[in-house]
């Protein structure tokens, strides 16, 4: 009987970090940790506390699938299906743009301008994930918002 190598959390992360680095992934260790946390349904601290925990075949298969997708430059948000933005987590698919950190600056600027103009109604055309309008309504609770989708796929 052949002994399979034991893939512990540490071993998987080290291998993936090197693999991602070779593929030009900007934050190889962080991305490896985020994907492994998604597979194990845990927080990142758990990876360090249980560093010697072996992964089972099902976990390895799911992780391998995620790693392959990320190595092909697919954004983490599309692999995970969600993206945190301001106070919320939004569902994202390839049919919508992934909310970016600089979009938070846009939302804050629009909120300030809306307050200054006394705007009560907001219109978001091409809503996508809804990150912009939802975040604006959080900042402007007295306002009302209207969403217009330009893609049926984004509405799903």
Predicted ranges, named:
Residues 1-40:
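Non-catalytic accessory regions of SAM-dependent methyltransferases
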Residues 7, 30, 58, 98-101, ...:
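Residues at secondary-structure transition points
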Residues 13, 32-33, 63, 73-76, ...:
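A general structural signal for well-ordered alpha-helical segments in protein cores
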Residues 36-112:
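Conserved AdoMet
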Residues 102-151:
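Conserved SAM/SAH cofactor-binding pocket of Class I
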Residues 152-156:
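A short, hydrophobic C-terminal helix/tail in secreted or cell-surface proteins
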């Amino acid at each position: 009987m052949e002994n399979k190598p034991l893939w512990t959390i540490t071993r998987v992360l080290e291998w993936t970090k090197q693999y991602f680095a070779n593929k030009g992934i900007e934050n190889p260790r962080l991305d490896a940790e985020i994907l492994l946390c998604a597979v194990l349904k845990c927080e990142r601290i758990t990876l360090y506390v249980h560093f010697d925990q072996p992964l089972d075949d099902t976990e390895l298969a799911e992780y391998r699938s995620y790693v392959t997708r990320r190595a092909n430059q697919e954004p983490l948000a599309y692999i995970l299906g969600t993206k945190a933005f301001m106070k919320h987590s939004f569902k994202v698919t390839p049919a919508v743009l992934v909310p970016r950190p600089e979009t938070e600056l846009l939302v804050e600027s629009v909120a300030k301008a809306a307050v200054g103009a006394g705007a009560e109604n907001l219109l978001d055309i091409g809503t996508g994930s809804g990150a912009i309008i939802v975040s604006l309504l959080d900042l402007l609770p007295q306002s009302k918002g209207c969403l217009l989708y330009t893609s049926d796929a984004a509405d799903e």
